[in-house]
Amino acid sequence: MVELKDTLLMPKTKFPMRGNLPNKEPEFLKRWEEMDLYRKVLEKNAGKPSYVLHDGPPYANGNIHIGHALNKILKDFIVKYKNMNGFVSNYVPGWDTHGLPIEQVLVNNGVDRKSMPATKFRNKCKDYALKQVVKQRTDFKKLGVIGDWENPYLTLDSKFEAEQIRVFGKMVDKGYIYKGLKPIYWSPSSESALAEAEIEYRDHTSPSIYVGFELVSEDGVVEKGTKFVIWTTTPWTLPANLGIAVHPDFEYQEVKVNGENYLLAKERVNFLAEQFGWENFELGKTVLGKELEYLLCQHPFLDRTSTVILADYVTLDSGTGLVHTAPGHGVDDFIVGQGKYKLGVLSPVDNQGNLTEEAGQFAGQFVFDANKNIIAHLAETGALLKQENITHSYPHDWRSKKPIIFRSTPQWFCSIDAFRSELLDAVDRTKFYSEWGKPRLYNMIRDRGDWVISRQRVWGVPIPVFYAENGEAILDNTLIEHVAKIFEEEGSNVWFYKDAKELLPEGYTHPGSPNGEFTKEMDIMDVWFDSGTSHQGCCALRDDLTYPADLYLEGSDQYRGWFNSSLITSVAISGEAPYKELVSAGFVMDGNGNKMSKSLGNVISPNDVGKQLGAEIIRLWSASVDYTQDVRISNDILKQVSETYRKIRNTFRFLLGNLFNGSFDNRTDLLSYDELEELDKYMVLKFEKVVAKVLDYYENYQFNSITTELINFFNVELSSFYLDYGKDILYIEAEKSQKRLSMLTVLYTVLSKSVRLLAPILSFTAEEVYDNMPYEDAESIHLTDFPAKNLIDDAALEAKWDKLLEVRDDVNKALEESRNEKVIGKSLEAAVEIYSNDNEVVELLNSVDNLHQLFIVSSVEVKENDGVAYDLATVKVTKAEGHRCERCWNIVEEVNEEGLCPRCASILNK
């Protein structure tokens, strides 16, 4: 005899409750690699419009961190979405492989850079970089990121280097490249110039001093011997002082105290008198700044004078209104000093940051060490009025984390002024996905100075410039193209082992070299010029990519980095931005919003998370945060994400178990929308709204909205209502009954569409779900397409069932109270009576068959008021009377001798 439990159509699936992700994910990765999934995706989409997300190259040094993981996963969401939604989207990952950090690693590991030829050291750098690429590539692939991993672009690749110097050549042709002596960021710790993008600001303690420069001019404007008081926080730059700047329109006041005469901005006198401890002072004459022009003051410790000059940048916010001017150590100082005043440029500091002979008695001292000795000398000579220490934001080398200086050295520059308006126009034409993105980049380009592109290092792409015998730099694009062809064949190392003649075209002559001798530039290019030309070295060079790219997506720090350098080089050569759209991500912080650091012990490693929880959890976390802002991650946050994942997985398991337990075949059993039961139509209508929203969110890269929308549907509409309601139909009704097939059609619609919509995000789990859908054709879910929008316009149906579900909420409240009062246990023990004074509600209730199934109770009557009033209805719950059916557990008036209600008896008799 068949047991009744065996007559129920219970869920059955091989899809396990536990994800076991750390063990399962490597199996999927192996499978995808063996089937060459990436190529198959591209083949499937051949002929479709191209969509190119161009990868900003991470630096090839060290393990990937959680910020790298977020970056690559966000890109993977987009590439997979585009490939499932009507595009062919090639994704070529890249690596930034030159630069100082790699040099430093080798030096720290005992490699003596100065004891070997440059070529040998460069080869060691290359070997190290390539090993780092292999290591990072393995880690990125573990995250489930799809792409052309076997053919990445590397900035050390000879073809990339050739394209890079071709960009340089085109910029030379347009007059955008020049060599000049200017104050630049200089890192003594790295012994190299730095670009703005290589600077970070940190708190730094500096001396704050007020110094008197004694007037030596005798023209009567101000009394001879008056001390012009300046303020500075960089005493080490005083040996480079050549001038004192005043504002032409400010009033300057003579102040007599203790037998000395001082000059200060009139507006600053009272504040400074208090600072200097002047109790009894007299005010002398007042003069305008422009009357002081060209006066000469004696330098406080060097045998020369400093010229008083006029400058509009002088302010009264701080200081004395008289500004220490060292054209070799400040941009404003340089500009005003090189104008009509011709002050010259003095920068008595060497590459290591030590003062030179031009600094007099302080020669040989490191700049920051010299501060205290200079201050002591000023105090001894009476030139020092006040000294204190201040903590302020100060630029540091972003790699060594040590303070940098402004220093004038001969450098190669890209002139921004030459095409700034074109750059700003290109920013205007770019689509941004955050309100602040456009003004941020626009203002940076508007306000930035010329770009110093030379570096005094070895590991990088050489600046392809030759010098004639007379010292003239030969800027000639035909020569640069000649070198580019050599680089293409032999790599840039050739620059370091061949002499200039071997690199020049045979028989080349130049008026500046009557003897036919030439030398090479030995500076290399800023690594931002490397990555900033990837639009040519990768996108324009590859047949499967396009220039400009559709999208660049990187961290928000790249507005001053890669977004910026790429824009400059691209507009310089073509007049257009290298990207049509820009998306930026915030930084990853710990659970309390603090930066991650090993010293704080708050670092979350993606490799560790992958081993413990699975990469899928990192992917879900990436899709659950608003990545456009700074985001947080911690072990507690990952536990919450894991719980969310568990619920998603359980929903998929329930759907699979009911659809594919042997009772349903989606190839033959699906019903059309018109054939569905009314409530099932309502669920399809609701779900299609979710699908439409999700598609819109994908189009705008709003991944946290995608997961929120789908998870809410799973938790609220499905788990809390529809699946609970449906158990009576799915388990109890006849296998091929209209009601059951109607509901299974809905479940299949939800499963087949939601698993596709989640495939770009939960790539491993979606594949596992798809494996358990037996009648699908594709080899992988990633070879299927997204569902199309299919909004159903049936406002009356939607309004009706929205209202009925509100009544259901009232019934659930009454059932919960009855449980608490021990009237009932399970809801099937309840008989429910409903009354409403809203005629619309009464009519709605009376229009629905089998209300007891909707409310998951044994019986429902709509009658006069006699219960607890809720929002829409009055509900009375009593314990149902009668007999419990042994199969469906509903309580009914009569059961047969086998304990079955009429419905179950009828089903089994069939």
What role is predicted for each listed range?
Residues V2-K14, R18-L21, E27, R31-M35, ...:
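Residue patterns forming the tRNA-binding/recognition surfaces of aminoacyl-tRNA synthetases
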Residues E43-Q104, Q164, I230-T232, W236, ...:
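N-terminal catalytic cores of NTP/NDP-binding nucleotidyl/phosphoryl-transfer enzymes
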Residues N45, P49-D55, I66-L70, L74, ...:
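Secondary-structure capping and boundary motifs in well-ordered enzyme cores
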Residues D96, I184, P188, L194-E200, ...:
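Acidic, turn-prone loop/beta-hairpin segments
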Residues V172-I199, L272-L283, L292, A484-S513:
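Amphipathic alpha-helical
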Residues P239, G243-I244, F250-L322, V331-I335:
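Protease-associated
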Residues S306, D312, K340-G353, R457-W459, ...:
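Alpha-helical recognition segments enriched in aromatics with Gly/Pro capping
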Residues P514, W889-V892, A905:
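Cys/His-coordinated zinc-binding microdomains
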